[in-house]
């Protein structure tokens, strides 16, 4: 479906400058230990031309629903980061808590991902931070602290979204702090 969708966008709207961003998730049943492994989550990134950006969820987290553990092992993230570099795909670092921000810094210091970095603050998921302006502020302050310590590069952009009733508070807080937003 990714290939057909991208092909239709490029064919029917040749002047459209929309960024093609494809997920690396989509199936919480897949992990390093599953029969297909995590490779199935990267097939489109490896094979479909025209993908410019791809999600990189910087750790495992709990969706708060039955069967809702979303596995992003260091093995998977290292392979994904290397694939993105090979294919010139810009990672969108989806971060659901502070630990994921720090993890991105570790992958950056190891050379698995390169600056500039783009963070997507994903707030309101049960297993992550709440979707409040205070949590946006805390995450932005943590990014700045890691930058000051040399554990994140200076070249960083940030966007944010909140789930459900947190959508507008996160959106307005992100905008007020000079960030981008995702609808």
Model-derived regions, located:
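Conserved, mostly hydrophobic/aromatic
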Residues: 1, 54, 104, 174
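Alpha-helix-loop-beta-strand connector modules within alpha/beta enzyme cores
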Residues: 2-24, 79-86, 139-153
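Active-site beta->alpha loop and helix N-cap motifs at the rims of alpha/beta catalytic domains
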Residues: 2-71
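Structural preference for beta-strand elements that scaffold enzyme active sites
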Residues: 17-21, 51-55, 88-92, 114-120, ...
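Active-site beta-loop-alpha junctions enriched in small/polar residues
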Residues: 21-29, 59-61, 94-98, 122-126, ...
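Short glycine-centered helix-capping/turn motifs at secondary-structure transition points
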Residues: 49, 111-112, 150
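Conserved mixed alpha/beta catalytic, RNA-binding, or beta-rich assembly cores of soluble enzyme
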Residues: 69-73, 80, 95-98, 102, ...
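C-terminal alpha-helical cap/extension of soluble enzyme domains
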Residues: 147-183
């Amino acid at each position: 479906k990714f290939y057909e969708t991208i092909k239709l966008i490029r064919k029917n709207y040749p002047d459209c400058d929309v960024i093609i961003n494809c997920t690396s998730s989509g199936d919480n049943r897949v992990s390093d230990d599953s029969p297909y492994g995590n490779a199935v989550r990267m097939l489109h990134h490896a094979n479909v031309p025209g993908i410019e950006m791809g999600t990189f969820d910087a750790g495992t987290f709990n969706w708060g629903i039955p069967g809702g553990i979303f596995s992003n092992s260091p093995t998977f993230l290292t392979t994904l980061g290397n694939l993105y570099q090979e294919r010139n795909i810009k990672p969108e670092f989806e971060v659901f808590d502070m630990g994921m921000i720090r993890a991105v810094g570790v992958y950056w210091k190891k050379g698995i991902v390169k600056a500039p970095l783009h963070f997507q603050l994903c707030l309101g998921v049960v297993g992550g931070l709440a979707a409040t302006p205070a949590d946006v502020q805390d995450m932005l302050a943590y990014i700045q602290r890691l930058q000051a310590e040399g554990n994140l590069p200076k070249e960083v952009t940030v966007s944010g979204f909140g789930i459900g009733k947190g959508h507008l508070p996160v959106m307005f807080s992100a905008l007020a702090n000079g960030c981008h937003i995702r609808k």
